[in-house]
């Protein structure tokens, strides 16, 4: 059988782990299995067929660094349609007065358009995998399948403000989606049960749904301890801190990943560590909504797996994970009053291997037999000159626009900054039309 091989040639290769560094190597990928087969220095020629009927395709990485694809571990992809719609407001007012009313008018077509726009932005800026909490999930799944990226998806369940029938319908939808789409797109798509938060889903509903999710080994993802106004009602109503409340509902296990964790007390950090649950840090969104500064150094010291996420484009307002990892490093230093806190390599780890680990997805590392979720970052720019320290540059100076090639599961999604799997012009045009239509319905 003919084998198709991709070889990424001539690049600096980022190696993470205990001793982060850079090596000079070519990376060989089996495009059928989607895995890295070899990392070496052997020269290869472009577009050739060898004696074993092997088709070889090359990507030029000269003057570039090859690194694991970035993982956006918490977002709401279709919220790209609400980018810039409602800014400069605190979280609860923003949600209740602007975002939730707008989302009530979202159509399946709009969610598809917004998700495709988000995926274009993510591929261009080096994200190969993401976690998406939203609705009209069949449209989200279709967009992911066509684009070639990797994701863990779920229906964002909200029961607050609904009668029992509507609440149970939403709850059932969350469970049905998690069961229906797990393993879709040749396993590139995984699922989770995704209650919005501990305050927007009632306790009795959580008890019922979490029990079913656990029976099916479905991970759980939710917003936790994002703002004081989210923490206080739980303390007032249950006389417990949020993560103690969550633990009592069996919502704190090694497969679960929580978004934000801004207002965590020491015992809650210990609970996360003991449970093996992961925390997704969303620094840009937390800054924009004035939610606070998550205690990332303390979480890392406790051994908690920390990933990074952009949150939705309505609260960020972009999906560039290079921005996010820089924000994480700098905000971590401010929060700890320590310039050595959250160093460059640690921030990159959170945006790659940390994200893959939190989501329970492959990726996040470059080694033989690992999945080929890779990006090539072009260092030939004034803002990346001189290259005293490539790892430092990736954390503090690189931008999403520096990404030259993007590969996911051994498939080239972007080559020389041209996306291969999506008609970008059509996506942008459709998203603009859907966004304007949404706003017209709102008015």
From Swiss-Prot:
The keyword Hydrolase applies. Its EC number is 3.5.4.28, 3.5.4.31. Its cofactor is Zn(2+). Pfam families: Amidohydro_1 (PF01979). Keywords: Hydrolase, Metal-binding, Zinc. Binds 1 zinc ion per subunit. Transmembrane segments: none annotated. InterPro entries: Amidohydro-rel, Deaminase_MtaD/DadD, Metal-dep_hydrolase_composite, Metal_Hydrolase, MTA/SAH_deaminase. The keyword Metal-binding applies. Zn(2+) binds at residues 74, 76, 223, 311. CDD domains: ATZ_TRZ_like. One of its GO terms (molecular function) is metal ion binding. Substrate binds at residues 103, 196, 226, 311. It catalyses: S-adenosyl-L-homocysteine + H2O + H(+) = S-inosyl-L-homocysteine + NH4(+); S-methyl-5'-thioadenosine + H2O + H(+) = S-methyl-5'-thioinosine + NH4(+). Catalyzes the deamination of 5-methylthioadenosine and S-adenosyl-L-homocysteine into 5-methylthioinosine and S-inosyl-L-homocysteine, respectively. Is also able to deaminate adenosine. Belongs to the metallo-dependent hydrolases superfamily. MTA/SAH deaminase family. PANTHER family: AMIDOHYDROLASE-RELATED DOMAIN-CONTAINING PROTEIN (PTHR43794:SF11), AMINOHYDROLASE SSNA-RELATED (PTHR43794). This is 5-methylthioadenosine/S-adenosylhomocysteine deaminase. It comes from Haloquadratum walsbyi (strain DSM 16790 / HBSQ001). The lineage of its organism: Archaea, Methanobacteriati, Methanobacteriota, Stenosarchaea group, Halobacteria. The gene is mtaD.
């Amino acid at each position: 059988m003919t084998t198709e091989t991709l070889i990424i040639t001539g690049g600096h290769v980022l190696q993470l782990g205990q001793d982060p560094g850079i090596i000079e190597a070519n990376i060989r990928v089996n495009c059928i299995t989607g895995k890295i087969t070899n990392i070496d220095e052997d020269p290869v020629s472009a577009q050739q067929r060898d004696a074993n009927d092997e088709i070889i395709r090359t990507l030029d990485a000269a003057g570039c660094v090859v690194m694991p694809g970035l993982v956006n571990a918490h977002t709401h992809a279709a919220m790209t349609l609400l980018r810039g719609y409602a800014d400069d407001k605190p979280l609860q007012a923003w949600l209740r007065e602007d975002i939730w009313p707008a989302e009530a008018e979202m159509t399946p077509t709009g969610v598809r358009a917004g998700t495709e726009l988000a995926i274009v932005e993510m591929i261009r800026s080096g994200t190969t995998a993401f976690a998406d909490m939203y609705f009209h999930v069949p449209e989200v799944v279709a967009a992911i399948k066509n684009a070639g990226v990797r994701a863990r998806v779920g229906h964002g369940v909200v029961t607050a403000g609904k009668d029992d029938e509507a609440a149970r319908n939403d709850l059932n939808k969350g469970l049905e989606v998690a069961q229906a789409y797990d393993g879709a797109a040749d396993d590139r798509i995984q699922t989770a049960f995704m209650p919005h938060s501990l305050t927007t889903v009632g306790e009795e509903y959580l008890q019922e749904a979490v029990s079913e999710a656990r029976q099916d080994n479905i991970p759980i993802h939710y917003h936790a301890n994002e703002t004081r106004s989210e923490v206080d009602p739980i303390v007032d109503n249950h006389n417990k801190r949020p993560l103690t409340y969550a633990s009592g509902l069996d919502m704190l296990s090694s497969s679960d990943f929580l978004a934000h964790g801004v207002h965590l007390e020491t015992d809650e950090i210990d609970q996360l560590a003991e449970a093996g649950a992961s925390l997704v840090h969303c620094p840009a969104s937390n800054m924009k909504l004035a939610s606070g500064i998550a205690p990332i150094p303390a979480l890392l010291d406790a051994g908690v797996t920390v990933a990074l996420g952009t949150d939705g484009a309505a609260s960020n307002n972009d999906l560039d994970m290079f921005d996010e990892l820089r924000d994480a490093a700098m905000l971590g230093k401010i929060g700890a009053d320590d310039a050595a806190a959250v160093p460059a390599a640690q921030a990159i780890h959170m945006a790659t291997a940390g994200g893959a680990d939190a989501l329970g997805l492959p990726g996040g590392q470059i080694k033989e037999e690992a999945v080929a979720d890779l990006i090539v970052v072009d260092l030939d720019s004034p803002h990346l000159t001189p290259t005293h320290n490539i790892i430092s540059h990736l954390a503090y100076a690189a931008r999403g626009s520096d990404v030259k090639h993007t590969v996911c599961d051994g498939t080239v999604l972007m080559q020389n900054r041209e996306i291969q799997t999506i008609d970008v012009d059509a996506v942008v045009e459709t998203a603009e039309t859907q966004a304007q239509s949404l706003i017209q319905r709102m008015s």
